[in-house]
């Protein structure tokens, strides 16, 4: 158990996972069990697509519960780095411009457990985050992306 993977995350990220876990345990799990009961009432289980779908969903829910419990148990809360406010670090938002065109992008660098690119939260394991971590406002950085290299200039860290 001592070698379990640790999951760096913000306090808010951990709270979000705890809320999802609570929902799965108190609401979703019961809904799925009820769907299984109803599907069993349809008779022969060998050709019962409703039963198969409900059992598949039950397996997914139970797997997600186990995964969330593990991530929460092994969460490492990211503390704000007040001593280096202009240095890119885990839990901070970084704004950069792509050079030479000047397109601006902002991301918050978080642990993989709470990464959500659609919300502007990228994993510290992503190529962009790896290139930016430890850098300062004003630094120009070459970032490796699936589409190739891009040069960026860090303009803000919050």
UniProtKB/Swiss-Prot annotation:
A Pfam family per the record: GreA_GreB
InterPro entries for the chain: GreA/GreB_C_sf (IPR036953), TF_GreA/GreB_CS (IPR018151), Tscrpt_elong_fac_GreA (IPR006359), Tscrpt_elong_fac_GreA/B (IPR028624), Tscrpt_elong_fac_GreA/B_C (IPR001437), Tscrpt_elong_fac_GreA/B_fam (IPR023459), Tscrpt_elong_fac_GreA/B_N (IPR022691), Tscrpt_elong_fac_GreA/B_N_sf (IPR036805)
TM annotation in the entry: none
GO biological process: DNA-templated transcription elongation; regulation of DNA-templated transcription elongation
GO molecular function: DNA binding; RNA polymerase binding
Keywords: Coiled coil, DNA-binding, Transcription, Transcription regulation
Keyword DNA-binding part of the UniProt annotation: yes
Keyword Coiled coil annotated: yes
PROSITE patterns: GREAB_1, GREAB_2
Coiled coil: 10-75
Family the UniProt entry places it in: Belongs to the GreA/GreB family.
Function: Necessary for efficient RNA polymerase transcription elongation past template-encoded arresting sites. The arresting sites in DNA have the property of trapping a certain fraction of elongating RNA polymerases that pass through, resulting in locked ternary complexes. Cleavage of the nascent transcript by cleavage factors such as GreA or GreB allows the resumption of elongation from the new 3'terminus. GreA releases sequences of 2 to 3 nucleotides.
Protein name per UniProt: Transcription elongation factor GreA
Origin species: Geobacillus kaustophilus (strain HTA426)
Encoding gene, per UniProt annotation: greA
